[in-house]
């Protein structure tokens, strides 16, 4: 059974045992967090029914580098910056 959960105003379609990366959370590794479950998919009535899901924080990591390149033509102006977003890896324990 799958569920649509919401963490930090972002929605994820998950099932039990999935490991996903979410925006950084204020929790230490090993903590269990309850998050809002918007809908359970795979039941006879897949209507919007709010509930809770439990996720376990595994690790805090940084995402891949995203290159931000700016240029102004004919002016010899170029800027190249990199950005790495802080992410939290969580595992869905129960829906």
Swiss-Prot record:
Please provide the record's keywords in A-Z order: Ribonucleoprotein, Ribosomal protein, RNA-binding, rRNA-binding
GO function terms (MF aspect): rRNA binding; structural constituent of ribosome
Described function:
This protein binds to 23S rRNA in the presence of protein L20.
Could you confirm whether the keyword Thylakoid appears in this record? no
What taxonomic classification does the UniProt entry list for its organism?
Bacteria, Pseudomonadati, Chlorobiota, Chlorobiia, Chlorobiales
Under InterPro entries, the record lists: bL21-like, bL21-like_sf, Ribosomal_bL21, Ribosomal_bL21_CS
UniProt similarity note = Belongs to the bacterial ribosomal protein bL21 family.
Query: Is the keyword Mitochondrion in the record?
Result: no
- GO BP, sorted A to Z: translation
Pfam families given for it? Ribosomal_L21p
User: Which protein is depicted?
Assistant: Large ribosomal subunit protein bL21
Q: Which organism is it from?
A: Prosthecochloris vibrioformis (Chlorobium vibrioforme)
- State whether it acts alone or in a complex, and with which partners, per the record: Part of the 50S ribosomal subunit. Contacts protein L20.
Any one annotated GO CC term: cytoplasm
